[in-house]
């Protein structure tokens, strides 16, 4: 059975990645990219609509954004919250619940999938500022949280 995970690293420039996973197999990275604010909703809406039309289950994983003393000082801080709101609205527009959004800590994603691990597993996005790589990390973390074991990391 096929399932999709759409993973998002929200911000002024956002990373978005779409994965497909068949039972018993490793996730397949279908595409990844980095998007500015005026481009952000389009790939999300397209991925959600295609999943609905094909009748494939889709989960959404997104980097959690927490406001603290440091983020208050950061001029870019509202962008992440705004992008998460847009993501939730895209979900609602196709009949999903905003509560179905799987928010994940950035530290968890980076700890489990640092750059060398992404390269070893061949989930690498070339170019950009690293936002697509962060989205890829969140997609893979979602699969780990739902039972996938990245055994490729154990190989020498």
What kind of feature is each model-predicted range?
Residues 1-156:
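Phosphate- and other anionic-substrate recognition elements at nucleic-acid/protein interfaces
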